[in-house]
Structures are given as C-alpha cells and as structure tokens.
C-alpha cells in the first residue's frame, strides 16, 4: 500500500477540542510532553447474568486504528491513534479524532511515514486521548481491521484498556461472496470492492475513514455485525501436506499464530461445516498450544 499523503486539519477539530475542559492552573505549569492525562475510572465489572437473549447489532461502533513503532508491544509502542464513532442504523459518522503520541524513535517510519521528530512537536495529544476515551464510552463495540494487532496496544500506558466487544473487519465479518474478496481482505481491497476510492494508507484516521465508508455502503450491516459477534475459537486444519490447498482455500493461515500449522478463527457452526477435519487450539502458558476434539466433515 502506498505511503501517507499530507493531511490538512479538518475544520471540526477546533470545535471538538473546545469541548475538552481547560487544565487547571496547577496542571498548566510545565507539564512534560509525555505526561499521561487523567482518564475516567474504569467502570466496575458487570455481575454475572443469566443466559442472554438473541443477539442484536451494536447501535454504535468505535472504528479505530493504530500506528506503531513495531509489531511487538514488548519492544515497540503505539505512536498514533485514529477513531471514528459510527451510528449503525443511521450509517452516520458521529465524531472522529486522531492524535500522535510522542516517541524518541520510530523504526517503522518506512511503513507509516511518521517521523519521530514530528510526534514530539507541540500538539494537544492529551486532549485527543481524553476525547478518544469519551468516544469509547459512547460505543457499544469496537471495530478494527486486524483487531488482534490493534487491541494488544490498549491497556499499555498511556492508552486505556478496552473492555468493549471487538469486531475484526478482516477476520470476523463474512463479506458477501459477490464482492470476490479474499478470505482476509486488506483495507484497500475492502474499500475498492465497495467503490470507495483509496488515496492514502498506513495512517490511522485514513484507514478508519475507509472502514466507515465501507460500512455506510453495507445494506445488510446489522446481519454482518451480529454474525461477527458470534463466539470464535482458533481451529487447526488436520490435513496432509499434499492437501494444504484445501486449508488455504478455506482461509486458513500457515504458521500464524501457531507455528507449523494451518489455523483460522471460526464459530462452531463454521468449523462443523468444513469439508475437512479440524481441531480446536487452546493457547497455554509459555507459548505452548493444546488441541482438543476434532470436528468437520471428515472428523466423524
């Protein structure tokens, strides 16, 4: 995907930031650039409830994306967050925000085009983070492309934990067959398949904008979201090397996340409908995996 293009500030941004309370005089004095803002206290965990009724689509989604200095949170850090609050029934964007987080170095500059020096320029990232938290509280679910990657950065200072349900637009949503998409499409391919022009990539808010435009064009969005929220587990294909194409055609990935295996996250119904046997994979401590009973057409 092509590198980022310069973005002009949106006219709404001053109005949104004007909604953020001004810091008290005590805090206004010489606060370091990387000082963490005061965030709302996390809501207490909800008590256990009886069996839920029929699922419904979330009324609001927080579409989010991150840009980072690497792939591993233990070695890298998040340097940009973009987010859009989206009303599902109305197919409407309610609010949006994007901000950079200061960093000393960015080894992934060749990917996201964000120079470390730019992240350290004066800008109200603390206010942006507070507004992001408010948007998160207003959403019923979070949607991200490759959510497994994005979610691992939240809960690491200064980003808050995310306790809302996650939906992955790459792996959890079963896009209609007539779009002729790969099993795990890229943001670019997903946008183009829905007639959304692509002008930039690898900046957080631009990728969120593409996803919002895709959702606006979905006539059966509620159905797609309800299905995407079904519980999923990781399954490993039980196929010989000669049969590996069957796994590839069914959207399984080789060596990711289980080394030396074809795996994919599926619902129980999806796993049972496969034309080849699969087994559940349970992550264990120390990176070891444990498999359980097989299912699929050939498992009986």
Per-range role (PLM):
Residues 11, 15-25, 29-164, 184-202:
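Conserved non-catalytic scaffold segment of RNase H-like nuclease domains
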Residues 179:
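Catalytic phosphate/metal-binding cores of nucleic-acid and nucleotide-processing enzymes, i.e., regions
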Residues 205-216:
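Acidic, divalent-metal-coordinating active-site segment for phosphoryl/phosphodiester hydrolysis
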Residues 162-176:
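Conserved beta-strand -> loop -> alpha-helix junction used to position metal-binding or nucleic-acid-contacting
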